[in-house]
Amino acid sequence: MTAQDYERLDLWLWHARVCRHRQDCAALIEKGAVRINRQVTRKPHSKIRVGDVLGLPGHPRPEVRIWRVVALASRRGSASDAALLYEVITENQGES
């Protein structure tokens, strides 16, 4: 009955379809390309909660994407399900 109020960062990124494979999500985090609430993290096991703000590298251009976590997932769903996990704050503004 007690649902977790957090999720591993690499797992959430995989659920949100940032990368095709969870290992790719972990590699992205380990190289320091992801920020949680403006803090760089290199730990795939970092915990995120609803309301956290993530900074992600843009693709294919190098701009930064800023997303707010609005939901946690228990499984990887369709692309439309993944879009419900975050709110785009800003995308492709070129700020680093």
Question: Residues of each region from the PLM?
Answer:
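Strongly charged
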Residues: 2-11, 15, 23-27, 35-96
